[in-house]
């Protein structure tokens, strides 16, 4: 069995495949750049790819493709209609990286509050006065608006509340009462 990946997955995932499959990691989100490598691919794991990148031509370049797996929850990068017509199931990994995505969002928010990127660049140049040029601020008692309180939005809200932030949420599927249970004020 041959498994092709647009890019490497986590070590735990690779360990599950060890000894069970030949693995080709393309390190390229554009399968058209390596169609010749897909000829005998049985499974295609898509981590990152442009919208529609896994198209009919990509699928047909393998004479043995049995499944397309997309890490995450979106199907944007896969032409699901063509896969369905070709009898190739497309699967996703819902929930697998929810916490990581939420933590990444919080990390970016904290980096912005402290001007981390610009400060890092300037301090590496020896410009220590950047601290005075751009004022950093604490997020405590600041307000965070979260649009969409699905699984990831709820985790972000929980983390923000843990940072003593006020959280306002907009979600057409949750009532004011449901949001209040999360500690979120409905927008």
Question: Which sequence ranges carry the predicted segments?
Answer:
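Rossmann-like dinucleotide/phosphate-binding beta-alpha-beta segment
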Residues: 133-187
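Phosphate/diphosphate ligand-binding glycine-rich loop within oxidoreductases
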Residues: 7, 42-123, 136
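Hydrophobic beta-strand scaffold residues
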Residues: 23-24, 90, 167, 186
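Short gly/ser/thr-rich secondary-structure transition/capping motifs
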Residues: 24-29, 49-51, 124-132, 181-187
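N-terminal glycine-/charge-rich "phosphate-binding" loop or analogous flexible N-terminal tail
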Residues: 1-41
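Short loop/helix-cap segments at secondary-structure boundaries that form the rim of catalytic
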Residues: 12-19, 35-36, 78-85, 174-182
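Acidic, amphipathic alpha-helical patches
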Residues: 31-34, 55-58, 135, 183-184
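Conserved hydrophobic/aromatic pocket- or pore-lining residues that grip, position, or stack substrates
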Residues: 83, 105, 126, 148, ...
């Amino acid at each position: 069995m041959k498994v092709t990946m647009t890019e490497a997955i986590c070590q735990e995932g690779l360990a599950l495949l060890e000894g069970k499959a030949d693995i080709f990691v393309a390190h390229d989100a554009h399968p058209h750049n390596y169609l010749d490598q897909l000829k005998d691919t049985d499974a295609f794991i898509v981590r990152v790819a442009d919208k529609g990148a896994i198209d009919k031509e990509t699928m047909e370049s393998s004479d043995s493709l049995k499944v397309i797996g997309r890490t995450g929850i979106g199907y944007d990068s896969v032409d699901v209609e063509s896969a369905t017509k070709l009898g190739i199931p497309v699967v996703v990994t819902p929930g697998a990286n929810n916490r990581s995505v939420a933590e990444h969002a919080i990390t970016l928010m904290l980096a912005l509050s402290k001007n981390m990127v610009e400060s890092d660049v300037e301090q590496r140049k020896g410009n220590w006065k950047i601290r005075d040029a751009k004022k950093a601020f604490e997020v405590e008692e600041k307000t965070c608006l979260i649009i969409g309180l699905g699984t990831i939005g709820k985790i972000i809200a929980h983390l923000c509340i843990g940072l003593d932030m006020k959280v306002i949420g907009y979600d057409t599927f949750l009532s004011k009462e449901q949001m209040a249970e999360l500690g979120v004020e409905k927008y």
